[in-house]
């Protein structure tokens, strides 16, 4: 099934992913991250308290969940110092910003499928896109793709289901 999604995916995005394995930030993004870090490094020691990670991320427009923060802290603060330097913070934020870009790209792709704007990808939507891309997929193969992504069994693929299958198949 995943191979069917790979076949129908636009090659440019998967090729782009292979060419740039490490996410790159613009100078402006790096500056924003530096400013958020400096805001919480009030004493100028070059470190911030890991407890402030959530607030610093919020300052950059992210809404991290408690579990997500705990995981990040355990990955960064291996010695258990309770402190994080700018390099660690930059690494975390580079990852978060690239994930945000990825999600936005996936949602743009979703909208290309969902041309009737129902908020779902139907069999008809998928068949149209496959035809536009010149993919010769049988109705059975197309239905398999829907079935693989469709978690709630309504016969269509929602935005969340589409995000999940695209990330699961590592197409983005």
Curated annotation (Swiss-Prot):
Residues annotated to bind Ca(2+) 1: 41, 43, 45, 47, 52
Residues recorded as bearing N-acetylalanine in the entry: 2
Annotated residues for binding of Ca(2+) 2: 150, 152, 154, 156, 161
Required for self-assembly, as annotated region: 2-25
Primary localization: cytoplasm
Residues found modified as Phosphoserine: 20
GO terms for cellular component: 9+2 motile cilium; apical part of cell; centriole; centrosome; ciliary basal body; cytosol; glial cell projection; nuclear pore nuclear basket
Localization (cell): Cytoplasm, Cytoskeleton, Microtubule organizing center, Centrosome; Cytoplasm, Cytoskeleton, Microtubule organizing center, Centrosome, Centriole; Nucleus envelope; Nucleus, Nuclear pore complex
Glycyl lysine isopeptide (Lys-Gly) (interchain with G-Cter in SUMO2) crosslink location in chain: 22
Keyword Transcription tagged: no
GO molecular function, a single term: G-protein beta/gamma-subunit complex binding
UniProtKB keywords: Acetylation, Calcium, Cell cycle, Cell division, Cytoplasm, Cytoskeleton, DNA damage, DNA repair, Isopeptide bond, Metal-binding, Mitosis, mRNA transport, Nuclear pore complex, Nucleus, Phosphoprotein, Protein transport, Repeat, Translocation, Transport, Ubl conjugation
Region entry Disordered, spans: 1-30
Domain of life: Eukaryota
Stored Pfam families: EF-hand_7
Biological process (GO), any one: cell division
Modified residues (Phosphothreonine): 26
Domain EF-hand as annotated: residue spans: 28-63, 64-99, 101-136, 137-172
Further comment: Binds two moles of calcium per mole of protein.
Subunit structure: Monomer. Homooligomer. Interacts with SFI1. Interacts with CCP110. Component of the XPC complex composed of XPC, RAD23B and CETN2. Component of the nuclear pore complex (NPC)-associated TREX-2 complex (transcription and export complex 2), composed of at least GANP, 2 copies of ENY2, PCID2, SEM1/DSS1, and either centrin CETN2 or centrin CETN3. The TREX-2 complex also associates with ALYREF/ALY and with the nucleoporin NUP153. Interacts with USP49. Forms a microtubule-associated complex with POC5, POC1B and FAM161A. Interacts with CCDC15.
Family in the record: Belongs to the centrin family.
Record-linked PANTHER family: CALCIUM BINDING PROTEIN (PTHR23050)
Function: Plays a fundamental role in microtubule organizing center structure and function. Required for centriole duplication and correct spindle formation. Has a role in regulating cytokinesis and genome stability via cooperation with CALM1 and CCP110. Involved in global genome nucleotide excision repair (GG-NER) by acting as component of the XPC complex. Cooperatively with RAD23B appears to stabilize XPC. In vitro, stimulates DNA binding of the XPC:RAD23B dimer.
Protein name, as recorded: Centrin-2
């Amino acid at each position: 099934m995943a191979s069917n999604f790979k076949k129908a995916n636009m090659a440019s995005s998967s090729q782009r992913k292979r060419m740039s394995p490490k996410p790159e930030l613009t100078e402006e993004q790096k500056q924003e991250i530096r400013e958020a870090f400096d805001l919480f490094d009030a004493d100028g020691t070059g470190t911030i308290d890991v407890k402030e990670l959530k607030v610093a991320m919020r300052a950059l427009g992210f809404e991290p969940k408690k579990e997500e923060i705990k995981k990040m802290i355990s990955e960064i603060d291996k010695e258990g110092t309770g402190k994080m330097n700018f390099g660690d913070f930059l690494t975390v934020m580079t990852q978060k910003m690239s994930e945000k870009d990825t999600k936005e790209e996936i949602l743009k792709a979703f909208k290309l499928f969902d041309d009737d704007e129902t908020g779902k990808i139907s069999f008809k939507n998928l068949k149209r896109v496959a035809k536009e891309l010149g993919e010769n997929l049988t109705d059975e193969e197309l239905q398999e793709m829907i079935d693989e992504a469709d978690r709630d069994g309504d016969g269509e693929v929602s935005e969340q289901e589409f995000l999940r299958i695209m990330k699961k198949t590592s197409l983005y």
